[in-house]
Structure formats: structure tokens, C-alpha cells
Amino acid sequence: MSGGAGIPDVPAFDASDVRLAIVASTWHTKICDALLAGARNTAADSGIDNPTVVRVLGAIEIPVVAQELTRNHDAVVALGVVIRGETPHFDYVCDAVTQGLTRVSLDSSTPVANGVLTTNSEEQALNRAGLPTSDEDKGAQATAAALTTALTLRELRAEA
């Protein structure tokens, strides 16, 4: 995965023995489907052809499903999009999802990568969704983060 402005270059790595799960919401379908495609591509490039994929309605449902997935997976990727509207709902959802995913990761000692886009506009989300016209692919980036963290944790635990 090639880096752009501030985005690290992630070298190719073999994660073929990592049990990967992806939970993706369905609001803003075009964006979420693109994030999921990027995640699947990165998984395949890393040797994982069939990650577990679970779809949920909205972003707020992602943490509890991620929590369940940590029970039998080595890494979880959370994908979705929350676009700012005219009410404080955006702030509540973004905070709840971010805190929920962080708590799940720490409580389970399992990497849970946060690929939930929190943007001010649909245009910003589309630009990060991994579409042909996008500048970034947050689905791919989150998957690389989850997998490399799982491999790092495996190494650290083997040394202990």
C-alpha cells in the first residue's frame, strides 16, 4: 500500500494464518461497500481469501458486533461512515463508536481497527472510501493496521 501525504508505506506481509473479521455498516451504501472492497483487497493481498464479513445497519451497532467477533478472531476491522448533520447526533454517534471500539480492543486484547469515517460532508467520505476518484482507501488502511497489529501482538506474546 503506497503512502501519500503523511500516510505510511505498508510493505507486503503474510497474514494468511490470521483469523480476520470485518464488520461494516450499510448506511451510505456506496461508501461502505467501497470501504469493504478495499478491506477485502488488502486481506487478499495479505493471504486471507475469506475473512468473516458481518453487515450491520448503522455505525452505532458496530462495537457490540466487533466485541462478539473478537471471541474467535485475531483481528477485527470496523467500517462505516457518519456524516455531520444539523444536530448533535453526529457527535454522540462518533464518540460512542470510537470509545466502544477502543474499549473492545483493550478489553479483548485483540486489534480492532477503526475504519469508521467521521466526516463533515459526503464529499469528504467519498474521497476516503477507496473509489477510483478517491485520494485514500480507509478500508484498506484499517485492514492493514488490524493485520499488522495482530502479527505484532503474536510476536510479543511469543517472546513472553
From Swiss-Prot:
Pathway: Cofactor biosynthesis; riboflavin biosynthesis; riboflavin from 2-hydroxy-3-oxobutyl phosphate and 5-amino-6-(D-ribitylamino)uracil: step 1/2. Pfam families: DMRL_synthase (PF00885). The keyword Transferase applies. One of its GO terms (biological process) is riboflavin biosynthetic process. Gene3D superfamilies: Lumazine/riboflavin synthase. InterPro entries: LS, LS/RS, LS/RS_sf. (2S)-2-hydroxy-3-oxobutyl phosphate binds at residues 86-87, 128. 5-amino-6-(D-ribitylamino)uracil binds at residues 27, 59-61, 81-83, 114. The active site is at residue 89. The keyword Transferase applies. Its EC number is 2.5.1.78. Homopentamer. Belongs to the DMRL synthase family. Catalyzes the formation of 6,7-dimethyl-8-ribityllumazine by condensation of 5-amino-6-(D-ribitylamino)uracil with 3,4-dihydroxy-2-butanone 4-phosphate. This is the penultimate step in the biosynthesis of riboflavin. This is 6,7-dimethyl-8-ribityllumazine synthase. It comes from Mycobacterium marinum (strain ATCC BAA-535 / M). The lineage of its organism: Bacteria, Bacillati, Actinomycetota, Actinomycetes, Mycobacteriales.
